[in-house]
A protein has these predicted regions:
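WD40 beta-propeller repeat fold
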Residues: 1-23, 27-31, 37-44
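Cullin-RING E3 adaptor/co-adaptor recruitment helices
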Residues: 193-313
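Leucine-rich repeat
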Residues: 1-4, 7-11, 21-27, 31-35, 47-63, 73-79, 82-87, ...
Length: 313
């Protein structure tokens, strides 16, 4: 930043230095106590010293509301940014991020978070601890699954997940009753997931545990070792209303399409106690087709009715 900026403009509120080739912001930034919007996208920030030391203690840490650092070279979210507690909008799209730090939860005033166009592979559950978040953009990454905790974002209005590696959504996402926009295009969704489903037969311990639970065999803690008592307490009920069985470690994963907001049919994950609890149309197609084959060949191995109502964006 130019020297003397804070002396010439002590009451500066908006600063746009986008596309100027900046490699570091400089100490001048710390002397702008009224700054609430900083736009520094499409630069070369991201190396050591890109952000001034002491940023989290500067008046800026309290005044800044909007920060856009998209189109730079950050490989991680700078820890100093996680101390800007007044931020309402943070954009770090088009960088080189490989993850989202759990401390993102410290930005509890955040309403808009843009992390699209990076190399993010996972979403930390802590992201769900942003009570004011309304717009979450995670498109064009390498995300394979959505943590069920994300359903705790009760203020969320827009969720962009297109062009990732998602094969299914947790059923908890149905709790996002205020969601108005959901983008999922460009994800594998159920195509390859259904093809690759496998079922591991239950162990003898699991078979015995299922018998005890389904037939209500009485037992007392003194009858069994503590480890088996704990094991029996971990039984999960099969969601098939015609079954009434339970499972422990061995289960069948099934995709079920569920109405969402009255507009879409989304593929959600269900866990069943055995393949017999799956409908004939929901059993996995055990294809040995390689990952390198085209999506059109993948789709041919999945019943058409499974794919025709998947939300694409």
């Amino acid at each position: 930043l130019p020297a003397g900026l804070s002396q010439w403009f002590p009451a500066l509120e908006v600063l746009d230095v986008s596309g100027t080739g900046l490699t570091e912001m400089g100490m001048e930034l710390l002397s702008l106590p009224c700054l609430h919007t900083l736009l520094a996208k499409n630069n070369r920030l991201g190396g050591p010293g890109s952000l001034p030391k002491g940023l989290e203690q500067a008046p800026l840490a309290r005044s800044l509301r909007v920060l856009n650092l998209s189109g730079n070279r950050f490989s991680e979210v700078p820890p100093a940014l996680l101390q800007l507690r007044g931020l309402r909008s943070l954009s770090l799209g088009g960088n080189r991020l490989h993850g989202i730090p759990p401390d993102i939860q410290e930005l509890y005033s955040l309403e808009f978070l843009y992390l699209g166009g990076n190399f993010i592979t996972a979403i930390p559950p802590e992201l769900a601890k942003l009570p004011s978040l309304r717009y979450l953009v995670l498109c064009d990454n390498k995300i394979q699954s959505i943590p069920p905790q994300l359903a705790q974002l009760h203020s969320l209005r827009s969720l962009s997940l297109h062009n990732n590696l998602l094969t299914y959504l947790p059923r908890e996402i149905l709790n996002l009753v205020h969601l108005e926009e959901l983008s999922l295009r460009g994800n594998p969704l159920v195509v390859r997931f259904v093809r690759d489903l496998t079922y591991n037969p239950p162990s003898l311990q699991e078979l015995a545990g299922r018998t005890v639970k389904t037939r209500n065999v009485p037992y007392a803690p003194s009858d069994l070792p503590d480890s088996l008592v704990r094991y029996l307490s971990l039984a999960s009920n099969c969601p098939n209303p015609k079954c009434g069985g339970v499972y422990f470690d061995s289960c069948v994963r099934q995709i079920k399409f569920v109405d969402f907001c009255g507009k879409y049919r989304l593929p959600l994950m269900h866990y069943l106690c055995s393949p017999e609890c799956s409908s004939p149309f929901s059993s996995a197609s055990q294809s040995s087709t390689s990952q390198s084959e085209s999506d059109s060949e993948d789709e041919a191995s999945v019943a058409a009715h499974r794919m025709q109502k998947v939300l694409l964006g």
